[in-house]
Amino acid sequence: MLLLHYFNLSHFQVNDHFYPHMRNFLYGETAFYVADTINMMFYIWVLFSAQQFHFNFTLVSGTQYVIHFFDNLAIIVMRLHSLLGFTDDFDIGSNVVFNGAMTFSVYCIVAAMCSLPFSILERCFATRYLKDYEANSRAYISYALVFLLNFIGIIGAILLQNKNNTIFVVAFLMILNLFALLTNQFLRTWNLKKYEECHSNVSIRFQRGGKYSLAKRFQISENIKSLHMLNFIILYMGFMNVCLVISVLFSSFDISPERQAICSLALDASIFFYSFAIPQIMTCFCHKWKVQTNTFRIRIGCLRTGKVNLEPLRDTFGGDMRGSVSMNRYFDQLQDSWENA
């Protein structure tokens, strides 16, 4: 069985005088997991209440947050089970609660590693159905993606019951994320091309007919914004994903308890950084998220209501934009759409 988030406390208690410090470290780490769980609960609320994104993108992204939330709960159960002396480190297979929590955590890790590629896959559908994707949500797309994401997580958890399968699961996850990176670049290039076409006086039609209506222009702009955010997340979090995958891979080897502890520490650090950083990155790109977080901070007294922070207008690419330019561009688009209707 693949052992993740595992510290052999019995070994350190017998062979290492740093055992008291390790127990204190694990108690502190458990407190961090509790804080991270509260953080996940808050941003799950922000994600669904702010309604920044299309329903399908919100549901797929929300699944990632929910997975992190339940993964934290599973790890907290594992930590308390071990720290309170219920775990038999000499016969780890006999611990039903501990093994159940670890298996669930393995499912969460595999599913979480698939969530970003599935978010990009949802943008493929948004690009395919430019004409009416905003008006016709096609909720079955997100339902199917969430089902497939969880199915892959379950299959991964089953396969990793035999740690000899770890290399195959890791290879699949790395290839999937590499494919997602390439797909994201392709979608960005394609949407940028269409964006330039729909703002050009020369070409105002798709090659196969049909006009660049306001709905299509809006969807193209939304695709560019979300893909830019996803690209930033992929590049920024790529190093953490590599650390996470490597720690999982090394945990599958027959290594000493000390090295197992190092792998678990690297895995935990990657998850902490991942779960704390992604909401912050998304907040930087999402105006409604900033409004929701500031409103909450005002309610709890962490932000004064007297100070008003003016948010500059942003164009499709996230740059500052003067109000007059923004208004003129909007009416130019409206006039072009009216003339070509």
From Swiss-Prot:
Its main location: membrane. One of its GO terms (biological process) is sensory perception of chemical stimulus. Keywords: Membrane, Transmembrane, Transmembrane helix. Pfam families: Sre (PF03125). It is found in: Membrane. InterPro entries: 7TM_GPCR_serpentine_rcpt_Sre, Serpentine_rcpt_epsilon. It is a multi-pass membrane protein. One of its GO terms (cellular component) is membrane. The chain crosses the membrane at residues 30-50, 57-77, 101-121, 140-160, 167-187, 230-250, 262-282. Belongs to the nematode receptor-like protein sre family. This is Serpentine receptor class epsilon-12.
